[in-house]
Amino acid sequence: MGKVHGGLNRAGKVRNATPKKDKEEKRKPKVGRAKKRMIFNRRNVAAVAGFGKKKGYNTQNVPTVA
């Protein structure tokens, strides 16, 4: 058997070092027909027909710096 990469004594060092943050109050997510409607509107209705490549579903509204 080969050895694992990195020792177990360093496991979890980043997570333990980050400060704890309280959970935010969020609206409950839509379910059922309302969720399907929201996804349909996001993909088809609100999408602007323009030039270039289609934006992916996981893209952010952050301008890219080239």
Swiss-Prot record:
Q: Which GO terms describe its molecular function?
A: structural constituent of ribosome
Q: Which Pfam families match?
A: Ribosomal_S30 (PF04758)
Gene Ontology, cellular component aspect: cytosolic small ribosomal subunit; small ribosomal subunit
Any GO BP: translation
Instruction: Give positions of region: Disordered.
Output: 1-35
Keyword flag Ribonucleoprotein? yes
Record protein name field:
Small ribosomal subunit protein eS30
